Amino acid sequence: GQHNFISDPRRYDSVVYSVTGKRPVVWGSDFSFNALGGNIADYHHCGPMNLTSPWGECRINGLSTETLRQNLVDEIKQRHAEGRIITLMWHCCFPSECNDCDGASIWTWQNRPSNEVWKELTTEGTRLNTQWKKQMDTVIPYLEQLRDAGIPILWRPYHEMNGVWFWWCNKPGENGFKKLWIMTYNYFTKVHKLNNLLWVWNTNAPRDKKGD
């Protein structure tokens, strides 16, 4: 039930039901991003919010960020009323691009932020740190709605941070990913009082064992 796409929030539930006759207890989705550029089809599989479901032709769906995220909140309220456990993630652009970027801004194999850029991001009051807060502020109102509705969320931001593919990956040490994680926790929990979030440290794990 995890990672139903924000533009097609019932697709995977329907697939599971068609095979098993049962609905997953865990229901999940993604705050996502708007894919830009000439290679949007390369990122269709992860469900950019401005694209149609990856099960069909890759097309722009014409819906706004605000509409899609509000629809997500409404869907979550329905699923929670059914007794489902809700989990949310976020494939987010680099903060300077907010919600609209080429997918290569997220899947940055070769051009992850330099140590200097990372330091600016995680230093209070810098230009990039301010842009990061503005980016966070684009999803916080929707999480506040869920808090006010009494809905707990398994919140797993910056997933697979021990990999090498996302812009937030492969930043060890006290001033690396750990600092970004604590900064995010403090901003959501202490500044915005989002006490309905259960924070999930979502590492990557190999799919198989060598030689198995």
Where are these regions (language model features)?
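Acidic-and-aromatic substrate-binding clefts and catalytic sites of carbohydrate-active enzymes
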Residues: 3-11, 35-37, 63-68, 132-135, ...
